[in-house]
Amino acid sequence: MDSKEVALDSRMATRKSDLHLFSKYVSVYYQTGLLEMLRENGCDTLFICGFSTSASVRAVAMESPQYGVRPVVPAEAVGDRDDYVHRSNLSDIEKKFADVVPVQAVVDYLKGRGGNGRKKGREDGNLG
């Protein structure tokens, strides 16, 4: 995107192989090819980051289990225009649809994976 408001944080280390999806719809599953890509690559977990917690983040967290995908929301990597709306939706998402975890838990989990996307060491799939 061309706007700084929706640009990726410059502190993020990215690779050419990283997939960044931007959708004009509430669900990133709609017309992006995400589900097909996840299935083709044997991915069963999706880390959901972005804006807004009450709309897009919630929609994807709700839809993911229906497709056999485990939704994980790094708590500090999502937001909304209103803090109360953000916090209440994040709490509801955690109670009903997804694992809501600290960003550091995701970082630690991803550090334990090999360059080919396969797990090294732990096989239980837990983040923390």
Language model region names:
Residues M1-G128:
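Active-site-adjacent betaalpha module
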